[in-house]
Design a protein with these regions (language model features):
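A conserved beta-strand-loop-helix scaffold within acyl/acetyltransferase catalytic domains
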Residues: 132-172
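Conserved catalytic-core motifs of GNAT/GCN5-like acyltransferases
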Residues: 77-87, 222-236
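Conserved acetyl-CoA-binding loop-helix of GNAT-fold acetyltransferases
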Residues: 45-50, 179-194, 213-218
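A short, internal acetyl-CoA/4′-phosphopantetheine-binding micro-motif in the GNAT/acyltransferase core
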Residues: 37-38, 171-178
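Conserved beta-strand-loop-alpha-helix junction that forms the acyl-donor binding cleft
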Residues: 62-67, 193, 202-213, 229-237
Length: 237
C-alpha cells in the first residue's frame, strides 16, 4: 500500500501513533487534536470498530476512497469530494526558494506558533474554515503565522505524517487580508522545512475550491487522487 493511500489510518499507525485512540480495525486522533478518523477497511468490521470509539451523537470525519454507502447505526452529516495533491518537485524551493515556483515577495515577519497561540489559531480556523482544527492541532507539527498589529491574520502548518511524506494544512488568511500573498509565503516556508527533512509535501483541498487549487498548482502540486471527505454521526440508542 502506498503511504498516501488510507493516509489517516497510516498516520495513526506509524508516525503519529502517539495521538491515536484505537479499537480493533479503527483509529482516531484524540478529538482535542483533530476529528480525523479512519479504519483499515470500510467494511462491517471497520464500522463496528469505529462504533466503539465514537459515542452516541458524536461525529467522525473520514477520508474515503469511494462515496459513502449507508451503514446501520450511522447518520450521514456531510460529504464532499476533495483532492489529494502532492508536490514531488520540491527541490526548486531549497536554499532561498529559487526556481520556477517562486517570485519576489517580502511579507511581514513569519513567526512560529505554539501553545500560547492556540486560541487565536482556533478562532482564525473557525472564521476561515480550512478544515478541522482543535485546541491541540498545533501539536501535530510546525505551525507558522503572520501577524498584523499583533493579531494573527494568516497561518499554515503540518498535520498528517506518514513515512516519507508530511501534509501541509490549515492554510488560511483572514478575509480582510486575502490576496496579499500571505498563504503562499507561509506554505513555501512549511514546504522548505519538509523538503529539508528529505520528505515530500502533500495536502488535501475541497475539489470546488478553485482559488486554492490554482495556488497549489502554481506551487508545483499535482492531483494524485480524488477522496471523499465524510462526516458521520453515530446514532443514539
Amino acid at each position: 500500500m502506498h503511504p498516501l493511500d488510507n493516509v489517516i489510518w497510516q498516520a495513526l499507525t506509524t508516525r503519529q501513533a502517539q495521538f491515536a485512540e484505537a479499537y480493533g480495525d479503527a483509529r482516531r486522533f484524540d478529538p482535542a487534536v483533530t476529528q480525523l478518523t479512519a479504519f483499515l477497511e470500510p467494511n462491517p468490521k471497520g464500522y463496528a470498530s469505529l462504533a466503539h470509539l465514537v459515542g452516541p451523537g458524536d461525529t467522525a470525519l473520514l477520508s474515503l476512497a469511494n462515496r459513502y454507502e449507508p451503514q446501520p447505526g450511522w447518520e450521514l452529516v456531510l460529504t464532499f469530494p476533495g483532492l489529494q495533491m502532492v508536490c514531488e518537485d520540491g527541490g526548486n524551493m531549497a536554499d532561498g526558494l529559487t526556481g520556477s515556483h517562486t517570485r519576489a515577495f517580502s511579507p511581514p515577519s513569519i513567526v512560529e506558533l505554539g501553545p500560547p497561540d492556540s486560541l487565536e489559531m482556533v478562532n482564525l480556523a473557525d472564521l476561515t474554515k480550512p478544515g478541522p482544527f482543535g485546541p491541540r492541532t498545533h501539536e501535530l507539527g510546525t505551525y507558522l503565522g503572520i501577524r498584523c498589529k499583533g493579531k494573527l491574520i494568516a497561518m499554515a502548518g503540518e498535520r498528517l505524517k506518514v513515512p516519507g511524506y508530511t501534509e501541509v494544512s490549515a492554510v488560511c488568511t483572514h478575509p480582510e487580508h486575502i490576496g496579499k500573498g500571505y498563504a503562499r509565503a507561509l506554505m513555501l516556508e512549511i514546504m522548505r522545512s519538509i523538503r529539508q527533512r528529505g520528505e515530500i509535501t502533500f495536502l488535501h483541498v475541497r475539489q470546488t475550491n478553485a482559488r486554492a487549487v490554482e495556488l497549489y498548482e502554481r506551487l508545483g502540486f499535482c492531483t494524485r487522487k480524488v477522496v471523499h471527505f465524510t462526516v458521520l454521526r453515530k446514532c443514539k440508542d
